[in-house]
Amino acid sequence: DWNTAFEAAGFKNAIIAKEWPNDPNMSLDDARYSVIRYLSSETENAYGPRIVDPRSGEIMESHICWYHNVMNLLKKWYMVQCGPLDKRARTMTFDDKLMGSLIQFVSSHEVGHSIGLRHNMAASSATPVEKLRDKAWVEANGHTVSIMDYARFNYVAQPEDRISEKGLFPRIGVYDKWAIQWGYRYRPEFKDPYKEKDVLRAEVTKKLRGDHRLWFVGDEGKGFDPRSQSEDLGDNNMKANEYGIKNLKRVMENILTWTAQPDGEYTDLTTIYNSVRAQHLKYTLQVQKNIGGRYTNNLPDLKVHDYLPRSLQKEAVEWLGRNLFVAPLWLYPDEVVSRTGVKPVDEIRDRQSSVVALLLAPGMLYNIYSTSLCSSESYALDDYLNDVFTAIWKPLNDPSELENNFRRQLHRTYLGFVEGMIKPSSKDGANANLAISRSDIQLFVEQHLDKIEESVKEQLAASKEGDLNYRHYAALLRNVQKIKEGYYGKDADTRSSDK
């Protein structure tokens, strides 16, 4: 696969793969030979290391290691992400052709490491989301510009798009070809490394100015820029993952059929079900990263650091409101839960609480507020708090009492984190950042507590006295008043947001 990239850089037959000969004088441990080595192991992974001469930077050799159970990992990825799109993925036993294609894609990624390329987790952000559903476009260009991203498969595509394997699998992309030219192209005209550096810098600047698909980010997806993330797709996480949720729902509708075992066991069902729920969590955390971060650019004509637009962050909060804070009960059908032993109430509660903790973390509020002071286009802190409140504090009128149970838990969790910011010494705020209590953020949080109190009073008045919801709102109101008394003292009862 990589030979096309090397041909563009001026080399033919740069990489040749041969079967290991039956020669007793050759050893896999011999540093003269670069090999793909099979490891009989339950580990679900593969890796491509390289040995480099520190004096010159020359890559001396590589042993790509292929654990046996990486095939199990590939099967889970492909069924969960592309089962609704490719009928070959609707069984626990993939045919040799499909598994061979999956192995080829991972092998190409590991070869990329062996020839010097790092992960580029920003590569997939160069593709507009709707292009991932354009059959002609995505089959011609691929769903990511680099196989060195963790872009896996095109989970954005929908069944009605009728996209083939060419538009679902990663491939050597335009970024990869550019990176090989940068690293390997022979430039005999240069004798002075300093002059070469100046010319190459000018060439790269010109190239990047005209083609942002060649952008590289080396943070392994662990920085503050939401464009650089592991296992995401497209230029908008919210739009992409909304499509991903649609496909996960299709997987759940068919999971019992696709994982059926003749012996009546449910080990395969449990394996795939765990992967579906893990995929949903990935979608959630990818969206959450679009809140409170910043863009980091090493592209010409752009600010090195720039703020995330308000609209993008607001879109992320609304996505979380739809797909997490309205409990994803579709992910826990009784016929699956009863066969796998998963505890929906515990898992949904823990996931919702974890994301609330991220949204109301002192560092998050500080980032949003400090950014708003520097840019009128960024998210104002009071707007942010109001939007998060709207996403979480939904009325307790859902036909499902289970959903109402989750909403009550969310109310209590939310109030607990607000208390932690009002009273940093409380159990929920023991580690609250001093930057909160010593800045104007404290005033915004106090104002927000007034909003919570007003909303709780309204819902309490609208509830039937003595029923569960009435007791819930009455308890919340008592807690709000205790928080105020502990912070403001005895005058808390007379204090009001409109006085």
Language-model segments: which ranges?
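Metzincin-family zinc-dependent endopeptidase catalytic domain
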Residues: 1-114, 139, 143, 153-156, ...
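Catalytic Zn2+-binding segment of zinc metalloproteases
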Residues: 111-127
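Generic structural "secondary-structure junction" signal
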Residues: 38, 54, 66, 119, ...
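Conserved catalytic/binding loops enriched for acidic/polar residues
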Residues: 124-499
